[in-house]
Amino acid sequence: MPILGLKTPGPSHPAHFDLEPLIRPNILALQPYRCARDDYSAGILLDANENAIGSSIPSLANGVASQTLSLLSDSEIASLNRYPSPTHDELKRSIAKLRGVPDEQWVFLGVGSDEVIDMLYRVLCVPGKDRVMTCPPTYGMYKVTANVNDVGVLEVPLITDDGKFQLDEQAAFEAYPDLKMMFICSPGNPTGTLIPLDVIRRVAENPKFNGVIVVDEAYIDFAPEGTSAVKLVNEFANVCVTQTLSKSFGRLGYLVAPPPLIQILTNTKAPYNVSLPTASLATAALSTEGLATMSRAVATLNINRKALIEELKNTKGVGRILGGNNANFVLAEILDSEGKPSNQKAVEVYKTMAESKGVVVRFRGSERGCEGCLRVTVGTEEECKEAVKQLAALL
């Protein structure tokens, strides 16, 4: 069903899904904040009570451009005292082209994907009433944001057989009724495991599930080609995908979703949530040269990931490498003297490495199915070798 007279309603499949009843009534009736800059962006701008004298950044006043500012055009630098574009359509079009959706109407921008996740809660979930589903071990901000918004969380743990992590479809099926959202992290954090697209498709098609599936793909650029759920967004009205430039590009989050949901989010967001420098640098990162640079970086990190896994496997005191290894990190078990995964030993190693060795990793042993685990981000070749060296010395 088109929302607010949308010209591009998006996919109509599955037949049982209707977005409009899911939106909070006050959000559905909301009249979005509008400003003169929505219609006019050039000329003598006396509409927004800005500082017309110019930016107060010292490097600009002294005529010295920093490395970051040097990537901005002269006109962009001259406009730092102005409010940024409320829409950033050029950037959205670049993302749409990169990810394979029709146009900018399918893209919503946020300051990191955490803002996007928070916005989804705010437009879909009634505080004190609605619930969402998460599948631990998973990204902790789903639950934090639910708590902030007074939304209930139903946890359906991933199946953790043999150190692998997959969605428990039967348990999820039994929990479907009355859920507003289901969060699927793929590749997972901290698991690094991809959830197969066929599994997500079955959830989307299930008539018992009337909510929105949110597939968090923060690490998708490190996974094999063709594994992104964005292709499902083109087909299903109840699937959306959060991604971020923070892992393989820079610092920006976005949602790829059918236009009705994008419009609702756009109506609700703060008018100038993404700054001009962020949008300009993100646009540069998505240029032909920027994409080539990103591809080289991802290829290098994937090579380093493979080498790191092999070195960890050959390190005494390190147990299994868990999960799917489709992200820019590795999840490794730390063993005690009896050869069993140990949270106590993992915490000891984690603290000593950070405080005495200058190597900071992440303790993940408190997560379901991750007993005794440290999560090691894939760094440069030298950083990975140093991390393994210091780890081996402590084991």
Spans of model-derived segments:
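Conserved PLP-binding catalytic core of the aspartate aminotransferase-like
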Residues: 302, 315-356, 378
